[in-house]
Amino acid sequence: MERNFNNFLVKIFCLGDDGVGKSCVMNSYSSGGPLTSLFQGSELTWTDYTVSVTHNQKPLKLRLVIGDQNELRRIKQIEFNDVFLICFSVDSKASYDNIEKWNTEIRKILPTPNIILVGTKIDLRKEGGELKKSIVTQEMGIEKAKEINAIKYMECSTATYEGVKEVFDESINIYMTKKLYIQDLRKKSFLIPKKNTNKKSCKTQ
């Protein structure tokens, strides 16, 4: 029997320090291109939207939420399969140092969350063809992802669109894997025969 993917609402929460590009990442993905050509001179805002996408030739709805600690606490329906993007900018060591803070806030609400650590603004990593000083390297991102028990470390740039779609494709894959796993477990639980507690033992007369 083919599953009805139209009923799935994939929830992706985007967190991180101010200025790391959370709204830009959401806008770039929903628009399907780099922001340099699509949103020149416009002010980008994003809070909580639902968008329709096609993933692996299946129509899906995504709820994309940008939030802080208070926003997370207000959202009552956070589920086991929801995905959290902890974002930091590779040109901001301060935002990198605050990753642990965001990880802690998420785990206060959900002890075993699905986290992808995302390094943004990778187009700013090099200046004049040379690696900038005091920049967060890919190796540092990978190591930090291991420290916070993230599922994966990924990087992107909304100026070039590099890696943006891949971040959300991976988020959807994680969500769907967990969602279908839970559904299959529930189905199997109905198939397990229940023990007959009313069965009487045979007694010798």
From Swiss-Prot:
Binding-site positions, GTP: 16-23, 66-69, 120-123
PANTHER family recorded: RHO FAMILY GTPASE
SUPFAM superfamilies, per database record: P-loop containing nucleoside triphosphate hydrolases
Main location: membrane
Entries under InterPro entries matching the protein: P-loop_NTPase, Small_GTPase, Small_GTPase_Rho
Organism: Dictyostelium discoideum (Social amoeba)
Official protein name in the record: Rho-related protein racJ
Renumbered ranges of motif Effector region: 39-47
Gene Ontology terms describing biological process: actin filament organization; cortical cytoskeleton organization; establishment or maintenance of cell polarity; regulation of actin cytoskeleton organization; regulation of cell shape; sexual reproduction; signal transduction; small GTPase-mediated signal transduction
